[in-house]
Amino acid sequence: MLRLRLLCTLLFLCCFLKTAAQEEFIDPPSKHLVTIPFVQFTGGVIVFKALLDNFKDSLNFILDTGSGGISLDSATVESLGLKPGPPERIIRGIGGVRKVGFLKKRSLHLGEYEIDSLDFHIIDYEVLTSLYGQKIDGIIGYSVLSRYILKINYEKQEIDFYTKGTMKYPKGGYLLRPYIRMLPYLKSTISDNRKSGFNYLFDLGAGLTVLFSDDFVNDSAFLKTKRKRYLKQGEGLGGRVDMYLTVMKSLRIGPYRFRNVPVNIFNDDYNVTSYPSLGGLIGNEIFRRFNVILNYEKQQIHLTPNRFFTSPFDYAYSGIELYLVDGVAVTGKIPAGSPAEKAGLNEGDEILAINNRFGMQLDDLKQALQSTYGKVKIIYRRKGVLLTTVMNVINISKK
C-alpha cells in the first residue's frame, strides 16, 4: 500500500512539473491602429502623408530605417512659422556631418491616429526634393518605428501600424533577427571573386540595391578586380557625392538569393558605415521585393517574397542624374567618360524629351533612361537654345 501511494505521488509530481514547465508569460496580442497608403519613388523609397500638430496641410515623409530619429525639412519649418531650438546635437550621414536644432514635444497625425511627444531635428532636405521631384518635408525613423509594429505591403502600397505585442507572422516567409541599436544591423552573404560575409545596415530609406564602403571592398577582396566601375552621382546628408556602379555575382539574405546584383561603392570619408563593424547597407531596391514586418521591440524583421521578387534589376548606365530645379528636369554633374559626356551633355542642361517623348515628369524621365539600352535620342535646352543628341546607354551587366 505504501508503495502504491509513493508511486501515485511520483506520478502526480511528474505531471505537475511537466505542466508547470509549459507555463510562460506572454505579451497581449498586438492591435491594429491605422492603415496608411504610400507611393514609391526611384529605388522603391516609401513616401506617405501625415499632419504635423494642428496644421491642416499634409506633409510628405520618407519612411527610413536608416534614420535614428525623426526630422523635418528646414524650409518646411520656416513656411509653417515654427522656430526650432538652437543647434544642440550632431548627426552624421553619407557625405557630411551637421549640427541640428529641434522642435520638441510635437505630434504627428496618421489618418485618425495621433503619435505624440516627438522631437523632430531640423535639416535641409532641398537635395531630396530636387532628386525626387516632389517636396520632401521630413523623414520618419527610429522615433516612430520603435513604438509600433509595422506591416509594409508593397503590392497594395499600404503600411499597417500595430501596437506592440504578440504577432503571428505569415507563412512562406523568413524571420531575420537584427541587432537594433536605433538602427537595424544584419549579416548577409555576398559572392563575386570569392564568398564573403557582409555586415550591413537594413536601410529602407536608401533607393538602391547595395552600397559598399570602398574600405570594405578593398579589404575583403571579394569583388573581381576586372570588374569595370562606372562613376555616378549619389545623394547624402552633405549633398551630392560621387559613387561607383558595378555588378557582383550574388547576394544572399536568409534563404533568398539574388544574382548579378548592381552595387554602389563610395568613399566613406565620415565613416557612416562604421567600418570595420559594417561594410555598408542594403537598400529598398532589394527589400521592396518582399512584404516586410518591422518589429523593433522583439528585434525581428519578417520578409515574405511578393510579386516584385523576380523583377529585373536596372543595369542601364548613362551617367545622367536628373534633378527638378524650378519645375525643370536638369542634369547634375556629368561623370568623365560617361555616355552622357560622350554625347556632349553638360551639367545644368534642361532635359525636355527622350526618344521624342515630351511632357514627361521627372520620375518618367528617369525611368526612360533606366529601362533603355543602346541609342537614346535626347532633346535638351542649354542657355535658351534647343539641342539634340544621341546617347549610347550602357548595359553594365554585359561588361
Region annotations inferred by a language model:
Residues M1-I26:
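Bacterial Sec-dependent N-terminal signal peptides
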Residues A20-K399:
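Pepsin/retropepsin-fold aspartyl endopeptidases
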